[in-house]
From Swiss-Prot:
Family, as annotated: Belongs to the MsrA Met sulfoxide reductase family.
Keyword Ribonucleoprotein: no
EC number: 1.8.4.11
Record PANTHER family: PEPTIDE METHIONINE SULFOXIDE REDUCTASE (PTHR43774), PEPTIDE METHIONINE SULFOXIDE REDUCTASE MSRA 2 (PTHR43774:SF1)
Higher taxonomy: Archaea, Methanobacteriati, Methanobacteriota, Stenosarchaea group, Halobacteria
Organism in which the protein naturally occurs: Natronomonas pharaonis (strain ATCC 35678 / DSM 2160 / CIP 103997 / JCM 8858 / NBRC 14720 / NCIMB 2260 / Gabara) (Halobacterium pharaonis)
Protein name listed in UniProt: Peptide methionine sulfoxide reductase MsrA
GO biological process: protein modification process
Coiled-coil portions: none
Gene it is expressed from: msrA
Length: 178
């Protein structure tokens, strides 16, 4: 059965590339959500005035992957303790955010963060926002499958490639062998 998750953990090019590695992921779409501007553009989101975050919407086969699996990958490939930034990318559009589609996703996200806190996984507080998804706006076409189309891009080699390698190593049993 196809299910959907919407997550933001920094630059969507990098997060998209990481999730595309997983068996059971049917598609990953880069976009914007969590803000107040209707149908925003990349330039508008980058201005920091729309309230939106760069996010990915992951369509996945819930018979192959659980929502909790996606959360585990998500919290492994980005730093949820960085407020309004990820690495060199600074601004609220790069914030850590889980946009839930239903109460079950909300409860699972809250429980997952609580388990990370209890386990002392991070030295700093987790600042990941958990909000109901109101509207997802698909990003412009040049942002879709960006790493796949631009594997030699210096930014992607420096930031997306390590996320991909992390997924391949830490989640080898879940990586798509296509």
């Amino acid at each position: 059965m196809t299910a959907t998750a919407t997550l933001g953990g920094g630059c969507f090019w990098c997060v998209e590339a990481a999730f595309e590695e997983l068996d059971g992921v049917e598609s990953v779409t880069s976009g914007y959500a969590g803000g107040h501007t209707e149908d925003p553009t990349y330039r508008e989101v980058c201005s920091g005035n729309t309230g939106h975050a760069e996010v990915v919407q992951v369509a996945y086969d819930s018979d192959v992957l659980a929502y909790e699996d996606l959360l585990e990958v998500f919290f492994t490939v980005h730093d949820p303790t960085q407020l309004n930034r990820q690495g060199p990318d600074v601004g609220s559009q790069y914030r850590s955010i889980v946009l839930y589609h239903d109460d079950t996703q909300r409860e699972l996200a809250e429980a997952y963060i609580e388990s990370l806190d209890e386990a002392g996984e991070y030295d700093d507080d987790i600042v990941t926002e958990i909000e109901r998804l109101e509207t997802f706006y698909r990003a412009e076409e040049n942002h879709q499958n960006y790493f796949e189309k631009n594997p030699q891009d210096a930014y992607c080699r420096m930031h997306a490639q390590p996320k991909i390698e992390t997924v391949r190593e830490a989640f080898a049993e879940k990586v798509d062998s296509r």
